[in-house]
Amino acid sequence: MKVAGFILGALIQFSLTEGHVEQNENANLTEMWGEDWPFSGIQTFAHLPHHKCLIDMEKKFDIGVIGVPFDTAVSFRGGARFGPQAIRKASQRQTSMRGFNFRADINPYQDWASVVDCGDVPVTPMDNCLALKMMTAAYENLLSHESQTSDNNLPPRFVTLGGDHSIILPALRALRKTYGRLAVIHFDSHLDTWAPSKYPSFWHSDTSEFTHGSMLWIAHNEGLLTENNNIHAGLRTRLSGSSFEDYDDDDKVGFHRIEADEIMDGGIKSIVEKIKSKIPSDVPVYISVDIDVLDPSAAPGTGTMEVGGWMTRELIRIIRELEDLNLVGADIVEVSPPFDPTEITSLAGAQIAYELITNMVKKGPIDPELIKHNLELSDKLTQGQQLLGFSSPTDELNDKIQKEQFVLQA
């Protein structure tokens, strides 16, 4: 009796399967084989289409994910060169089929924007001076693409997977030429506005000035940042010496500071309000996320951990509240897989990258008139600096520009 039941069940199963195959004989190949499981397929970010964006200049898209596997500008633990691979691997449960962001009410992979994975910049680990040139040239190349939304005359936007934090400098250099001076929201446990002379070494060279802790100081001195619309958020690092001298130096670079502990007093809402109060609605914004902004319990796989950080849940909520900003570029950096045995750091990195892409998509295409206006203001400020012999913008410079009638006209 049991044998007869087994045979009957097998026949029914065969009949059902045969019927399904017959009903789908006319299915095309994409319908049959176009969807991957999280564990199948080539590991692009979120199973996005892969395009060699540095080579194929004819390809049009709106948002690109680009890896920059560079980590030879670190001051402590390395390993972030393997970050892009790890973040892509951790993103494999993201797909366009199952990509709806319940926090934002959109699926960024099925909306107006064409989102692709551009692969990696093959940056040298042998020579930091050459690496900086390579990364800058790569970003300039990427920004010479046309976006699929061709009516706005602006290039695609990019989310970068690092790599150590120094990779923000070549990105800002390239973006400055396209968008003008940028307001930077810098999620990090460290200031990263240290002058190279702050590092404890008698030995210095031009190459040694370029580090993952000095790049925002360099960016300021090169006129890449807005004067007073930049934010550090999540700070909790120890400072130099026996005073707030590092904060005094940071003031001169044009940053406002939000310390990690502030979230305990005013909650997430107060953090968001403080960020938004410093970022005008008419400037292009770059968001940089150093994974060490998170507490080591949530992100142990990084080079310079600091205890007492935010949780992933809190950072995601803060990013979600910034979706109305004019986000023209972003990065997630300092993910170091050798120190991430359970992969929770790379998983956090993949989620943060997803949230940043969501922000770009939900905001929609950037208004080209806004960018034109910002470029004009930025160029006039730079010209004023050069005429007056200033190497970087300060309040003193702005006062003097007005007195000399180098007034920035709208």
UniProtKB/Swiss-Prot annotation:
Organism: Kluyveromyces lactis (strain ATCC 8585 / CBS 2359 / DSM 70799 / NBRC 1267 / NRRL Y-1140 / WM37) (Yeast)
Binding-site residues for Mn(2+) 1, renumbered to this chain: H165, D188, D192, D290
Pathway assigned in UniProt: Amino-acid degradation; L-arginine degradation
Enzyme superclass (EC): hydrolase
Designated name of the protein: Guanidinobutyrase
Annotated signal sequence range: none
Cofactor binding mode and count: Binds 2 manganese ions per subunit.
Keywords, comma-separated and alphabetical: Arginine metabolism, Hydrolase, Manganese, Metal-binding
Function: Catalyzes the hydrolysis of 4-guanidinobutanoate to gamma-aminobutyrate (GABA) and urea. Involved in an alternative, arginase-independent arginine degradation pathway via GABA.
Catalytic activity: 4-guanidinobutanoate + H2O = urea + 4-aminobutanoate
Cofactor names: Mn(2+)
Binding-site residues, Mn(2+) 2: D188, H190, D290, D292
InterPro entries registered for this protein in UniProt: Ureohydrolase, Ureohydrolase_dom_sf, Ureohydrolase_Mn_BS
GO molecular function, one term: agmatinase activity
